[in-house]
Amino acid sequence: MRCPSCFHNGTRVLDSRPVDEGRSIRRRRECESCLNRFTTFERVEEPPLIVVKKEGTREEFNKEKILRGLIKACEKRPVSLKQLEEVTQNVERELRNLGISEVKSDMIGEIVMEALRDIDDVAYVRFASVYRQFKDLNVFIEELKDILQKERE
């Protein structure tokens, strides 16, 4: 590892510890030349996950987009940001565990909706109304009936 101060290539590791729930390693290093101490992080590089949109275009998966949608759906609801971040992480983990490099956007939407259904019904309906693009009030009412039916079961 090259020292950021003197650019010497010789450094030694003083301390290593796992961070980010074991997904990264934090290393404290010291330059053998100038004795400067600095920190580095090592993590596994995930292969890109490509989202195939409804119109056929492709873009790289962006968990921030999911988080923004969740925040909007949960606006003025008793749902913490931490819960939404966990949902976002769980969605990404579930998609990566599929072992495929491309995933359709509607699959992502369904996974997000299922997670929201367990957290807050109102947020679920808000998200579903945008995601499923309810055309009229009847479709909206049917979705509400569906939620009520599942709660009774």
Swiss-Prot record:
Disulfide bonds: none annotated. Its cofactor is Zn(2+). This is Transcriptional repressor NrdR. One of its GO terms (molecular function) is DNA binding. Keywords: ATP-binding, DNA-binding, Metal-binding, Nucleotide-binding, Repressor, Transcription, Transcription regulation, Zinc, Zinc-finger. It holds the Pfam family Zn_ribbon_NrdR. GO terms for biological process: negative regulation of DNA-templated transcription. A zinc finger (unnamed) spans 3-34. It comes from the Bacteria. Binds 1 zinc ion. Negatively regulates transcription of bacterial ribonucleotide reductase nrd genes and operons by binding to NrdR-boxes. It comes from Bacillus cytotoxicus (strain DSM 22905 / CIP 110041 / 391-98 / NVH 391-98). Belongs to the NrdR family. The keyword Thylakoid does not apply. Residues 49-139 form the ATP-cone domain. InterPro entries: ATP-cone_dom, NrdR-like_N, RNR_NrdR-like. The keyword Mitochondrion does not apply. Coiled coil: none annotated.
